[in-house]
């Protein structure tokens, strides 16, 4: 009994610490209600206490919430819904959740359950269509953000598991589903962590081969970086610019991809690192000073203009801004140099979380990529009502993603019917179609389809 009381006190205290921002739910009473709900659920069904890795579901969820708050910037009822997801597995339980915690929490929880109901097949998971299906089924962009945080947190905690099969399944989802979504959202730090951890679990020998080689060559690499940046430092100082520089070793996953693409060993990859120059510039002078540094560097070192990447003039759809150039340094080695400001660097590293501080970065485009990028402006408001309106996805107004009986995933226009799906598969199938069987039930050719269905 004493142990249960201690756990309850710890849960409430942890919740209050995580939800410390005055604009973030829950208040003290709600923290206690959450504790009551979880305590009751696990007492009724003890199997809800631990997951397939033997980890305590509630404690694991609390750690994921802290990650989501600190590293992504998520706020509001999505956090409560995610925590309750640890002990709620059936849609009909959401009615009870709504009575305890309100409509918004229950609706978000239903989104989590819809995503969990999707049957994940590795072949389909590798496609943009599957990622778009997940986004569509979630219905609320914060659910997708929480799922990214959930995946990162879980990957951090399963390194010593004996359940290797489950570890490989989670790692595959991390590599092909959540890392690409994190990339689209500009969450590069989390994306890189997911990629490295998935490689560690899926390609153990390759991961440690690269890691050991990086450790063995660190001293010579650091010495080369110092020789490369010394003249640049003198030039920047002479111009009176405020800045700092660092050499950034490419991620293990990135190096592994280069080795496969170039069909070479570790020592055949020439660009193991990049130099990052980060300027302390006022926003009004950001571009001017970045291009000034570009001019100084290309005057000093021979440049490869084919490798110029200008994301200052036109930022990436996820808000990424930087200027990349590859130049020939000492010993005729090609070196990538990234030029950006403090603001740009924080957004590049922390994505959405940084946009709570830096306002006004906008993107344009179409489709799901544009939608993912545009949620940034809604997150900046901090207004729960506007967030709900801006982040909610009306599936009926978006593309429909449906599976064929063989498990292939198809993207269809909004309001597509059984007949539309038949013609998408093959003209002959459409010509012969007089009805369809969707999720085991018969429907007319005019029946509208919903994302996630199997026809």
Regions found by a protein language model. Give the residues of each.
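Outer-membrane beta-barrel domain signature
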Residues: 51-55
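Short alpha-helical scaffolding segments that buttress acidic/His motifs in well-ordered protein cores
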Residues: 34-41, 78-84, 108-113, 144-155, ...
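Hydrophobic or amphipathic alpha-helical targeting/insertion segments
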Residues: 81-115, 187
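N-terminal alpha-helical scaffold/docking segments in eukaryotic complex subunits
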Residues: 24-34
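Generic structural signal for well-ordered secondary structure
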Residues: 31, 57-61, 76-77, 90, ...
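An amphipathic alpha-helix signature
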Residues: 16, 32-35, 65, 94, ...
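Alpha-helical scaffolds flanking conserved acidic
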Residues: 59-63, 74-84, 104-108, 142-145, ...
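Nucleic-acid processing machinery
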Residues: 2-23, 42-50, 60, 66-70, ...
């Amino acid at each position: 009994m004493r142990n249960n009381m201690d756990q309850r006190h710890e849960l409430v205290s942890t919740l209050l610490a995580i939800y410390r921002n005055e604009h973030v739910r829950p208040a003290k009473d709600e923290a206690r209600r959450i504790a009551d709900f979880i305590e009751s659920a696990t007492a009724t069904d003890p199997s809800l206490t631990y997951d397939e890795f033997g980890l305590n579901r509630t404690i694991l969820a609390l750690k994921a919430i802290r990650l989501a708050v600190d590293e992504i910037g998520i706020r509001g009822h999505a956090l409560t819904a995610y925590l309750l997801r640890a002990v709620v597995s059936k849609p009909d339980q959401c009615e009870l959740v709504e009575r305890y915690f309100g409509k918004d929490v229950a609706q978000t929880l239903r989104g989590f359950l819809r995503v969990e109901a999707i049957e994940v097949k590795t072949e389909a998971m590798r496609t943009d269509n599957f990622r778009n299906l997940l986004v569509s089924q979630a219905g609320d962009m914060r659910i997708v953000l929480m799922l990214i945080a959930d995946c990162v947190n879980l990957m951090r905690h399963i390194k010593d598991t004996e359940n290797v099969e489950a570890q490989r399944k989670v790692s595959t989802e991390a590599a092909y589903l959540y890392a690409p979504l994190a990339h689209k959202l500009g969450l590069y730090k989390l994306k890189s962590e997911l990629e490295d951890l998935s490689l560690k679990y899926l390609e153990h020998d390759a991961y440690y081969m690269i890691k050991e080689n990086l450790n063995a060559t660190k001293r010579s690499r650091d010495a080369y970086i110092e020789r490369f940046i010394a003249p640049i430092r003198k030039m920047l100082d002479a111009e009176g610019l405020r800045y700092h520089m660092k050499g950034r070793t490419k991620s293990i996953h990135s190096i592994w991809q280069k080795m496969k693409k170039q069909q070479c060993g570790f020592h055949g990859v020439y660009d193991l690192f990049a130099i990052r120059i980060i300027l302390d510039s006022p926003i009004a002078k950001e571009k001017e000073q970045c291009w000034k540094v570009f001019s100084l560097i290309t005057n000093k070192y021979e440049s490869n203009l084919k490798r110029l990447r200008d994301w200052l003039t036109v930022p990436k759809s996820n808000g990424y801004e930087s200027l990349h150039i590859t130049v020939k340094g000492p010993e005729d080695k090609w070196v990538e140099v990234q030029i950006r400001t403090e603001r740009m660097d924080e957004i590049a590293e922390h994505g959405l979380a940084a946009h709570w501080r830096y306002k006004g970065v906008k993107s344009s485009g179409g489709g799901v990529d544009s939608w993912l990028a545009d949620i940034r402006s809604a997150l900046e408001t901090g207004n729960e009502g506007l967030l709900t309106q801006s982040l909610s996805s009306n599936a009926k107004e978006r593309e429909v993603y449906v599976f064929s009986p063989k498990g292939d995933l198809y993207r269809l226009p909004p309001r597509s019917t059984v007949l539309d799906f038949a013609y998408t598969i093959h003209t002959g199938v459409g010509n012969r179609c007089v009805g369809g069987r969707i999720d085991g039930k018969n429907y007319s050719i005019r029946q509208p389809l919903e994302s996630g269905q199997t026809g």
